[in-house]
Amino acid sequence: MKVLDFKPRLFSTLKNYSKETFMSDLMAGIIVGIVALPLAIAFGIASGVSPEKGIITAIIAGFIISLLGGSKVQIGGPTGAFIVIIYGIIQQYGEAGLIVATLMAGILLILLGVFKLGAIIKFIPYPIIVGFTSGIAVTIFTTQIADIFGLNFGGEKVPGDFIGKWMIYFRHFDTVNWWNAVVSILSIIIIAITPRFSKKIPGSLIAIIVVTIGVYVLKTYAGIDSIDTIGDRFTIKSESPEPAIPTLNWEAIKDLFPVAITIAVLGAIESLLSATVADGVTGDKHDSNTELIAQGTANLITPLFGGIPATGAIARTMTNINNGGKTPVAGIIHAIVLLLILLFLMPLAQYIPMACLAGVLVIVSYNMSEWRTFKALLKNPKSDVTVLLITFFLTIIFDLTIAIEVGLVIACILFMRRVMETTEISVIKDEIDPNDELDIAVCEEHLIIPAGVEVYEINGPYFFGIATKFEETMAQLGDRPKVRIIRMRKVPFIDSTGIHNLTSLCKMSQKEKITIVLSGVNEKVHKTLEKSGFYELLGKQNICPNINVALDRAKEIIN
């Protein structure tokens, strides 16, 4: 396998870079940086870390993904998909555990790219992607209920699970702070209607500016102090991040490895999906393996500076494209804009109401929910609906790690079932039409099957799901012929169970004085059977290139 085909798009685009392209990238980068600001703060807080860590992630990961990535226009940073995972890790293992899990996920992503496995991600069934994306959306919405309504739990700890959260919400719903509810609803309305007036100015930024000013006035001049702001819960730091090496131990690595796999898989899916969507708009074609290496590098470096997991962000990538972003330079400028905000304007973030950020995340969860797609998938075959619903409910009730693992297992089982259903095993009893496709030599007459000969045709892969089906087909006939011809011209591959099945069949047939003859074996299957040693048992004289030769061989055996 060829490895390490690493070609960052930045370096190829700079060869013919012009002043006009730079000005276009500059404007796009500034706008994307402004769009990313409220999202980075909201994602950081919702994940259970301080707001500046969300911005640090957007800065470092955004810079690295643009510098090393395989897409011209991809914008990286924290996303809503990781909120649930990050929050769960911090609750159970603390921020040190989050650093370890993110580092391992970064290594896994790099390995996926190095060994050119980016295409494998595309084979994850769509119902699984929609199921866990919609499940994450519901979970994000659930985590924001307390801030939307300003609930007071009286020191009672909010459970981490979905059902536990709703139970405590209902128990304390009489503590609703209606000022918080008004702030959240107003924020949602502003975000929803802003695109009608301006496509370029992000609604989330307008909502934060308008609502923050309004709440500041209410607190300062009307004496309303019941609306919590970021400054009421966090100490805002306005300084450049410094690297810190985490303490690693084997027990933590073992415990967090499944979570790291989830982060890597989710990050790979979201980043490649974002890059694919961008390709559809720009007409470009991204390098998925280079993109995965860049994503992995970002997740390897970002946590050392206190950041959280990052990936390609569809909304910010589309904002980049729509505002004229042409090359990775736009993504680098977006990171620089955020760095300047962190260094010089971060203290202003303390005045942002928590209820306003909750409103921002409600819109994020709505956009993530893909409810129209979810509804459409419910009309698909029952197997797809089963995968969709199981992944969805497991994501909500348990966690994303379990949802992805179980969803993939179920999808594999259903896939094998479909292959079994499409693979046909037929019995040809009397004669074979000479016009019957490929492996018959030129012949004008029908090929007569002699008495004492059975011809079986397998149409499809010969793997462990089909072996039993073949045995059942032979058992139904109940005959004991002298020769069994197995026509394998339409068998694309055979696995170990298929080889074992053929070996068992051959040994059993030899005991019953029945000869097995193979016909029309393709080159790939031929090499597999030869390498396994099966031909030594069968006898090379019983391997025939087509059905004509196989029938002649059968006549020799009978006579």
Predicted segments, located by residue:
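Short secondary-structure capping/turn micro-motifs that flank functional sites
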Residues: I336, V525-H526, P545
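Generic hydrophobic alpha-helical segments
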Residues: I86, W166, F470-M474, A550, ...
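Short acidic-hydrophobic, aromatic-tinged amphipathic segments that line or gate anion-handling sites
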Residues: L537-R553
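Active-site-adjacent beta-strand anchor residues
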Residues: G76, G131, L518-S519, C544
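Residue-level detector of flexible, active-site-proximal loop/helix-junction positions
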Residues: G135, N152, Y462, V525, ...
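Short, contiguous clusters of charged residues that form electrostatic/catalytic patches at enzyme active sites
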Residues: A28, I188, A192, T468, ...
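The feature marks cytosolic C-terminal regulatory regions of anion transporters and related permeases
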Residues: N367-L537, K555-I558
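Transmembrane helical cores of multi-pass ion-transport proteins
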Residues: M1-K429, P434, K513, G533
